[in-house]
Amino acid sequence: MKKVSTWMYTLMQPIASFLLKIVYQPKIINKQAIPKEGRIILAGNHKMLLDPVLVSCGTRRLIHFLAKDVFFTGVRGFFMRRAGTLPVHSGKIHKDSFKSAIDILNQNKVVGIFPEGTRNYTEKQLLPFKRGAVTLAQETGSKIIPFAIHGRYLPFHGLRIEFGKPIEVESMDLKEANQLLEDEVRKLLDKAEKEKAGEKNKK
């Protein structure tokens, strides 16, 4: 396996996480769902470029995120490659990235994926999930921890992330596994909406 550089993540993640917590004061729910060791895939919805930092607030473990290859250019690409990020080509996991992700998981590390494949700028709650997360889970026997990011990306406006219970998809049909993951993320988003509505009614 080609060594994946991570020194930039180790250096910058604590700083970025600290600043995000000060500015946005996000509510982080059920972060104990992420085990302190073992191979894990974190998978959830995607709205903004800040999402990887927000997800990383839930664990001290280093997360190898997958990102579009178009971001791997110039200065930004330099930093992303040294933050342990793996490129995704044309909306699909490139075979080299897929192999790298498998190797990372087989070393009992953490991979982060946004199964929508892009940031969701629509009014829809979720875009259709691509199958990269469940495919990796089945290839490596990894559990998937779904997460849902909810709220406005403005300072002090109730931004939150909730991690769900780990799901196992190793013995499932790929299509059914992908639907299960999407359903679990949707449940977390629905829960956040209900809680937000309840808070408004109390005012």
Task: List each language-model region with its residue ranges.
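Non-catalytic C-terminal accessory region of glycerolipid acyltransferases
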Residues: 2-7, 96-203
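Short hydrophobic helices that act as membrane-entry/anchoring signals
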Residues: 2-24, 77, 81-84, 88
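Helix-to-loop junction immediately C-terminal to a conserved catalytic motif
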Residues: 14-45, 109
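A generic structural signal for well-ordered alpha-helical segments
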Residues: 19, 58, 80, 104, ...
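Catalytic core of membrane glycerolipid acyltransferases/transacylases, capturing the structured
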Residues: 21, 36-92
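Small-molecule pocket liners
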Residues: 24, 63, 159
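Structural motif corresponding to alpha-helix initiation and N-cap regions
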Residues: 28, 73, 95-98
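Short acidic-hydrophobic, aromatic-tinged amphipathic segments that line or gate anion-handling sites
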Residues: 28-29, 86-89, 169
